[in-house]
């Protein structure tokens, strides 16, 4: 990586000049009703789209006033508590929720089995991808590692640039399939090169769920308990709401 110290003096001068020449009067934000970040000045989330894919209720009306409340999370009109209760005891809560968010309805048994089979088929990375992309440039910032991996995967995608729905669904399924591998392998590379830990690359098992494969690939002995897998499965389900609508 470039030696930033070599240009530190000049960069400091450039920074001061940039700040001086690009200052914005704070009163203009209120004058033109410009949102700063994802919330307005009253703390309300900024409306960025109109969908029923997901919704978060963080406020309620009391005496004509909006006040914070115990949050409610909805996926396609389903309260997430109801989803978790309905999927309790099943191995594929995350997969069922992914089907719901992508396709708009809860899957039946056959549909869920078909969807999880698709995920298993796509849970593979290009030849030497782990070595050449993940291991050769490990990062302490896992989001940086994931971003780089996804951008590089685009070079292996024959459907890149296509906008038809089928191609985009295929791309979504492929990304859902490989993200656990990208995350775990990226962590192991960082742990080995930056922290002096051990390196081990475990392959995913097509018969296991996403949560189970995450734990299998993460652990040195590939072992985990049913409780750990269940808790992680629910955690993955809850974290699916991140800018989805």
Language-model region placement:
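Hydrophobic alpha-helical bundle cores within soluble ligand-binding/oligomerization subdomains
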Residues: 1-245
């Amino acid at each position: 990586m470039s030696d930033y110290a070599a240009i530190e003096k000049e960069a400091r001068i450039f920074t001061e000049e940039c700040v001086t020449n690009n200052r914005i009067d704070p009163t203009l934000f209120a004058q033109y009703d410009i949102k700063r970040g994802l919330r307005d000045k009253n703390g309300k989330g900024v409306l960025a789209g109109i969908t029923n894919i997901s919704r978060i209720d963080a406020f309620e009306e009391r005496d004509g006033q909006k006040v914070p409340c115990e949050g409610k999370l909805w996926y396609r009109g389903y309260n997430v508590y109801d989803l978790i209760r309905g999927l309790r005891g099943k191995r594929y809560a995350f997969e069922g929720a992914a089907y719901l968010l992508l396709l708009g309805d809860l899957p039946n048994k056959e549909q869920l089995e078909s969807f999880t089979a698709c995920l298993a088929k796509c849970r593979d990375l290009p030849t030497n991808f782990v070595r050449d992309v993940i291991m050769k440039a490990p990062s302490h910032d896992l989001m940086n590692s994931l971003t780089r991996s996804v951008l590089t995967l685009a070079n292996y995608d024959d459907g890149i640039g296509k906008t038809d729905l089928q191609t985009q669904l295929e791309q979504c399924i492929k990304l859902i399939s490989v993200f656990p591998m990208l995350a775990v392998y990226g962590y192991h590379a960082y742990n080995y090169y930056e922290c002096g830990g051990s390196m081990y690359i475990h392959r995913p098992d097509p018969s296991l769920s996403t949560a189970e494969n995450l734990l299998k690939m993460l652990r040195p002995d590939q072992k985990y308990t049913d409780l750990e897998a269940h808790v992680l499965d629910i955690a993955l389900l809850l974290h699916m709401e991140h800018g989805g609508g």
